[in-house]
Every structure is written in structure tokens, then in C-alpha cells.
């Protein structure tokens, strides 16, 4: 249920079983010692609000499948060690701040499939200061205000289909999405041959706090 493993500092890894349908709100929130590569089974259709908020996971991979999945608000926000996200071919919606304030997140892949990505909501990837590349599926719909706000290193946007389809499907708010519009848009692409390096060294500021990373490890 809600908050089932919330604020559990003894939890260091988790294996989610095939057949699981829902990850509840706050399920693993504030589990700072939860680390490693998180795999979400292909049967999961909802990742609840703040489900993995402020955890130490290194990556997230969602299994491909036929059942659409929704990623709710703050599901993976403030994850200081999250380096990349492979979100499958079945994402219906990414809600507000779902991946916001992830300081070393380097790339995001949303594969092409039969599901329409109805919306990337406001602030979904805000303040992802190391985000360099994202792949969007053909049936991407609305990209809301500030969805990519304060992502100064966003350089490449890959789109799975043609420019004609992009113009037909995709509607991007002009409000605080300059980083998105300044990136290079690649049509008919499944992403780069090699995704950006996830190794990061430097200072990262999250709201009023500053953090030093050495070779992508928070010091």
C-alpha cells in the first residue's frame, strides 16, 4: 500500500516481480540507501507519486510490453545518483516533476510503440542539469510548460518518425522550454549509436544545496 517501504534506510536493493501491476505512492520514498539498477516489470501500469523520491538508484529500466504505463508526479525526482532512464515503448504520460531535480541524469529513452505519449507534463525534467539527450516516440502529444526548464546541457532530441509526423503530433509549450528548442532535433531516429557518457564530475546545486560529484559518485 501507500508508503509500504517509505523511509527504510536498511533497504539497499529491490527486485520487483513480474506480474506486479502498481507501485504505490511513496512506496520507496526517502530510501536513501536503495541503490543499483532498478528494473520495472512489463506488467506494471502505474508508478505512483513519489514512489522512488530521493532514493539512490543508479538507473531505471521499464520493460517493454502491451500495457500502457503512467509515471506519476515526483516518481523519480531528487534522485541524486540517477544516471539514465530507459522508459519502454508503452508510456502514456509522464506527470509533473516525475524526473525533476535529477542532477546527473544524462539521457532518457522513450521507445516507439503503439501507445500514445499523451503528455510530458510541466517540470517533468526540470533542473536536470546534466541531461544531454532524449528519445521521443512517434505519438508524442503535448510537452507542457517548463517540462525541460533549466536543462542547460540538453543538446539532442531524437524523434522516432518523420518531420511531418512530428508537426502533426507534437505540441511543445514555449513557456520555459528554451533548452528544448535550442537542442538539435533528429527525425526518423531511434537514438544515437552511443548514448552520452554517464560519468560526471563537478558541483551540482539543487535548490539551495550544493553537492560535489567525482566520477558520477556523490561525495
Where in the sequence are the language-model features?
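Consensus positions within tandem repeat domains that build extended binding/scaffold surfaces
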Residues: 1-4, 24-29, 48-51, 72-75, ...
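Structural signature of tandem-repeat unit edges
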Residues: 8-22, 32-46, 55-70, 80-93, ...
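Extracellular/luminal Pro/Thr/Ser-rich low-complexity repeat and linker "mucin-like" segments
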Residues: 94, 120, 143, 208-215
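A structural signal for leucine-rich repeat
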Residues: 125-126, 149, 170-174
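Short, conserved catalytic or adaptor-binding loops enriched in Gly and charged residues
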Residues: 172-184
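Extracytoplasmic/secretory-pathway segments with low complexity and glycosylation-like composition
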Residues: 197-219
Amino acid at each position: 500500500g501507500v508508503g509500504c517501504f517509505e523511509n527504510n534506510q536498511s533497504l539497499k536493493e529491490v527486485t520487483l516481480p513480474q506480474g506486479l501491476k502498481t507501485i504505490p505512492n511513496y512506496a520507496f520514498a526517502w530510501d536513501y540507501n536503495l541503490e543499483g539498477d532498478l528494473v520495472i516489470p512489463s506488467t506494471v501500469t502505474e508508478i505512483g507519486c513519489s514512489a522512488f523520491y530521493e532514493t539512490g538508484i543508479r538507473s531505471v529500466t521499464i520493460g517493454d510490453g502491451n500495457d500502457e504505463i503512467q509515471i506519476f508526479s515526483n516518481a523519480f525526482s531528487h534522485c541524486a545518483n540517477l544516471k539514465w532512464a530507459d522508459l519502454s515503448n508503452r508510456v502514456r504520460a509522464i506527470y509533473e516533476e516525475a524526473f525533476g531535480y535529477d542532477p546527473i541524469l544524462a539521457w532518457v529513452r522513450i521507445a516507439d510503440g503503439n501507445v500514445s505519449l499523451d503528455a510530458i507534463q510541466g517540470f517533468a525534467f526540470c533542473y536536470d542539469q546534466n541531461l544531454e539527450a532524449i528519445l521521443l516516440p512517434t505519438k508524442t502529444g503535448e510537452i507542457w510548460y517548463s517540462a525541460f526548464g533549466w536543462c542547460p546541457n540538453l543538446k539532442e532530441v531524437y524523434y522516432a518518425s518523420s518531420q511531418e509526423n512530428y508537426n502533426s503530433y507534437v505540441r511543445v509549450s514555449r513557456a520555459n522550454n528554451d533548452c528544448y528548442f535550442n537542442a538539435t532535433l533528429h527525425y526518423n531516429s531511434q537514438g544515437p549509436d552511443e548514448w552520452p557518457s554517464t560519468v560526471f564530475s563537478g558541483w551540482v546545486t539543487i535548490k539551495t544545496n550544493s553537492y560535489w560529484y567525482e566520477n558520477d559518485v556523490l561525495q
